[in-house]
Amino acid sequence: QDGQHCIAEEHDIVYREDPAPGAPAPVAQPAPEGSDFSRSIHPDPVLLFRYSALTFNGHRIHYDAPYARDVEGYDGLVVHGPLLAQHLMLLAEEVGGALRSFAFRASSPLMHFETATFCRNGEDLWVRGPDGRQCMSATAEFA
């Protein structure tokens, strides 16, 4: 903006091997108990399709339910990690003000039929799935 560097973004993306046939599913960690503030959304296929279009994300796990189930092995459409992170970032800004930095890590996929609860406790943020598992964690540093 006016020749000034305003935002720096870094991505560390880890792609894992497919699990061996018959291997047990990883155990999801429980989300922290208690929060200063929380709110929930109910993602649906239309939201995921629109977000895919907006972000030019062509991965079919976000908009093609038969593919997500039958080929990738998910229970339904997968909610985008960056969509969850954006909701956490908005929650942080609404409660704490302008951000200096924001970092997040996805830990368990959230399906389109699951309620996502966005929680904040100070600078710590997380997404809780309907079964109490932690789907994402984040930290916010305020300006």
Residues covered by each model-derived region:
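Catalytic strand-loop segment that frames the active site of acyl-thioester-processing enzymes
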Residues: 11-79, 93
